Amino acid sequence: MQMLNSQTILNSEEETKNFAKAFAATLKPNNIVLLNGDLGVGKTFFCREIIKYFCGENTSIISPTFNLLQTYKTPHFTIYHCDLYRLKSPEEIYELGLEEALSGNLTLIEWSEIIKHLLPTPLIEVNLKLLDDDKRLCNITNEY
């Protein structure tokens, strides 16, 4: 399934789950995925489905909103899930150990705008937009 540089309308929560898992199947270590969109649009939900794809459906997934970073081990790499909503300056990211996350691991970053210019390329960007209560527009691009 071609996902990079694509635009898809997701009509339900179930469709979003399935799409996120299909997207996860295209990911590998060293990928950096930036998730953007308004508050409550489903960035964390999308990340949860990616993490479940690699770690199993029963994995306990905690939103990183308050501590900024959560890690999840897979047999071959670690998934770093960051939520930078509360970040005040780009320099704060170094205190989290994000540099380690970027080498050989899968990194998912919500609210990435504040540090995007500091990240190595290529980057995969997932932009979510609310169309109505259940519908989302998902635009995925690969930036070099």
UniProtKB/Swiss-Prot annotation:
Mg(2+) binds at T44, E110. It is found in: Cytoplasm. InterPro entries: P-loop_NTPase, T6A_TsaE. GO terms for biological process: tRNA threonylcarbamoyladenosine modification. One of its GO terms (molecular function) is ATP binding. Keywords: ATP-binding, Cytoplasm, Magnesium, Metal-binding, Nucleotide-binding, tRNA processing. ATP binds at E13, G40, V41, G42, K43, T44, F45, D133. GO terms for cellular component: cytoplasm. It holds the Pfam family TsaE. PANTHER family: TRNA THREONYLCARBAMOYLADENOSINE BIOSYNTHESIS PROTEIN TSAE. Belongs to the TsaE family. Required for the formation of a threonylcarbamoyl group on adenosine at position 37 (t(6)A37) in tRNAs that read codons beginning with adenine. Is involved in the transfer of the threonylcarbamoyl moiety of threonylcarbamoyl-AMP (TC-AMP) to the N6 group of A37, together with TsaD and TsaB. TsaE seems to play an indirect role in the t(6)A biosynthesis pathway, possibly in regulating the core enzymatic function of TsaD. This is tRNA threonylcarbamoyladenosine biosynthesis protein TsaE. It comes from Rickettsia bellii (strain RML369-C).
